[in-house]
Amino acid sequence: MIKFSDYMIILKGFNMKKYGLLLFLILSISCFSENKKFQQLQKDTVKGKITEEKSISEESTNEIYKDRMKNFIREIRNDAGKNKYIITQNGNELYFRDGKLDRNFFPVTDGTTQESLYYGDVLKYNAVTKKESKDYMLSLLNPVRKEGKPVFVINYAKGNEKKNFLLKEDAKTGFVSELLPEFEARAIYNPIQGFNSENITNLRQVKNYLLLLNPEKFSDINQYFEYLKNTDFDLLLIEPSHNGVFLTKSQVEQLKTKKNGGKRIVISYLSIGEAEDYRGYWKKEWSKKWPKWIVKENPDWKGNYIVKYWNSEWKNVIKEYREKLESIGVDGYLLDTVDSYYYFQEKMENGNKIPD
C-alpha cells in the first residue's frame, strides 16, 4: 500500500502547474482503489475456523439464507417463550441489514458471543487476532452492545498480561471476556473479573461466565454436576449431558445457586446449524445414508454436519431435542452454528446454489 508520504516525495520532482491535473487523477484513482481494498473480504471466526465475509458497507443484497436463519431463531423464541434466554454464538451479522441494525430481529435474542475477538486467531492458541479481523468483528459488536445487548467474548489464551489487557478492553467496550485454556471448551479456568456473591437475575448483571461444552474429563454426570455446583460463576454456558445422560431437573435447579449462595443463570448449548452424530437424536441409519437435509461434514469438526436448517424435518429434530432441555429446566439456550448460513450464501454467490 502506498502511503501519503510516498506521494509527497514524488510530488517534489513534478511541475505542479503542468502536471497537477494528472496527479489529481492518479491520487483519486489510488485512494478509490485503497478504499475498495479496505472494504474487501474480512475474516470472522466460525466455530473454530475462519470464514471470509464482506464488510457491512458491501453486504450482499441477497440475504435469503441469512433471513432463513433469523426466522429459525424467531421460531425457537416463539416456542420457548419470553422467559427463556437466547444467546447466539458468533454470526453477529445476523443483527444487521443493509449496514444498519435490524430492528425487527434485534429484540429476538438476549445476548451474543464472539470467539477469538482478541486471542485464538485461526485456531492458534495464544495467537493475537489479526487487526483487520478484530476491527471487523468490533464493527459488528460495538453497535450491538451500545444498544444494550450483552456481549460475551471467548478468547483462547493464557497469561496475566492478557487478562489485564482484556480487563481494560472490557472497561471500554462493556463486553464480558474470558480466557479459555483450550479450544475444545472442556477445561476449567478462573474468571478474569473474579467471583462475586451477587444475585444474577439477568444477563446484563453477568461479570463472569463458565463455558464448558465437553465434559468428557468427568467420570459421569454426577461428578460433572458436583463440580458445577461447587463453582461461583455468574453464568453457566454448558453442555447439560454426559455420554447421553442428562442432568436432572433437580440438579439444574441446584445449579442456579452459586456455591456462595448467590443466584445465577444456567444456559444449555444447542447447535441449530449443524447436526452432531454424538447427540441422542442421531439415528444409526444416518451414518450410512444422510437425510436429505444434511449437506456435508464440517471439515474442521468431525461428526458435525452442515444442515439445511430451514428444512422442516431438521426443525422437528431440534424441537424435540429442545423439549428435552425444557424438561430439565434450563434458563435458556446458547444457539451455536447460527453462522452456517455463510456456507449456503457463498455457494449461491459462486453460482452453485444448493437445492432446497
Where are these regions (language model features)?
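Positively charged n-region of N-terminal signal peptides that target proteins for export
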Residues: 2, 12, 16-19
